[in-house]
């Protein structure tokens, strides 16, 4: 007769996130000792970790937190959307985010090397992944600073945690600054600009766009005298699509993002956008 109860199985499942049969087998092997059973579950899970190393991790979530004038955002990946919405996975992401905020880490290598309960965070992630039965990866981290920082998280499906996240910082304080920062963060989530200002666009990319615009205009038979104006117009169109401050504001397309910032009396200082898997 088993020397454990249904309540013991339930409690162990809640503590480990393991399936019912795995928990029962571990309790049998441990002769009902819950702590020993947890150790068995973890060992068996870690043995399978090497088999999971080559697996694709295209699902997951984005998490972010603002503390004063500092915003931190992470992306944590797993293999399936089933695990992505699991409480244990979401709790792990929260743990990683808290470590990122408290440690001051600004890059992935530093974050993963940060000690948590006497071991590197990277080991904690592998162990938790073993319990979940999937490869789990902390893919990236962003840390931005500003007088006012907004973090916006967007769900692309009501059944999943946030798949898109934005950190947006401005040099300015007060209600107007906070409102502008939030509204523009929402805009960034939807419009996905690749650059904050024109100065951030690599010169070689601009020159490439210019050459393409010129060759396209010539192929269309545009008059030589009009080429310069046509090329500049098309390069400006490129900026309007790729550069945040040049984009039409999603909330009011009659304004540019630059105008929204000017009306609020603030200057944009940093922006980061994560989308799971991209």
Swiss-Prot record:
Family matches, as CDD domains: UBA_EF-Ts
Organism domain of life: Bacteria
Region (Involved in Mg(2+) ion dislocation from EF-Tu): 80-83
GO molecular function: translation elongation factor activity
PROSITE patterns, per database record: EF_TS_1, EF_TS_2
GO cellular component entries: cytoplasm
Localization, UniProt: Cytoplasm
Keyword annotations: Cytoplasm, Elongation factor, Protein biosynthesis
Family statement: Belongs to the EF-Ts family.
Function: Associates with the EF-Tu.GDP complex and induces the exchange of GDP to GTP. It remains bound to the aminoacyl-tRNA.EF-Tu.GTP complex up to the GTP hydrolysis stage on the ribosome.
NCBIfam families: tsf
Protein name, UniProt field: Elongation factor Ts
